[in-house]
Amino acid sequence: GEHFCGRVPPIAVLPNGKTNLIALDLGIHGDPIKALERIVEIAKSGLGDHVVQRELIALTDGQTTRPVLGMFLGGAGLADYILYCRDKIYPLGLSNGFSHFLTALAVLASLVFGIRARFLPQSSHPVSISLMREGQLAGRFSVLIVTTLERLLLGVDPGDSRRGNMKLMAVDQSVSALLRLVWASVFRRMGKQQMQGIHLEQGDTIRIEGAQSSVILDGEIFRASEGKPILLRSTEPVPFLRLAA
């Protein structure tokens, strides 16, 4: 914001990656050139209702001199699955959809059937998650998500934003918890009631700590360790451009 005199102009995000979660949350998808053309049209005709406010996640790990900003963080087992897909599946040159399908099959083979092999994802490391004023979670999680996007991965919406701007979902590393997650996501039941093994929380400050535990913030990898936690804080609202008014 220091590069602009006065009010910061809205930020437009173009789809240019494998998942594009931020762009999708803002209604921007498909060909980035066509999306840019649409953005130019909106800018010429007036931004109006296309400007929305979004908080960012500010990550510090004790090593970076300035906070790293993002909107979607994956940790615990999810970070391992993302890295597995990036390192093992994407190099095969397959389409994004088929690559994600193969990754899902590998995760199921590892978690559900207990198959252990070098070419399959490994078990997640124990991690401790602390939320200011909300207590602490500790254990092995197959999924850990922290985001300021309106909707989480799989369409999950934890609800009440008054408890904090960062939304957290942690799923225990167990077959039963994973099946409950799939069932609740398919039938849009997530957040409607408490479910064993699925933790939905919100807060403005989140601390993640664990031996050799990786997190990925918008594609960038960070590692938490004992005595060197990762600290997440929500920022003040930032204006973004949403294509669908």
Predicted ranges, named:
Residues 148-149:
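Glycine-/small-residue-rich beta->alpha transition segments that form the dinucleotide
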Residues 21, 152-153:
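Flexible loop/turn segments at secondary-structure boundaries
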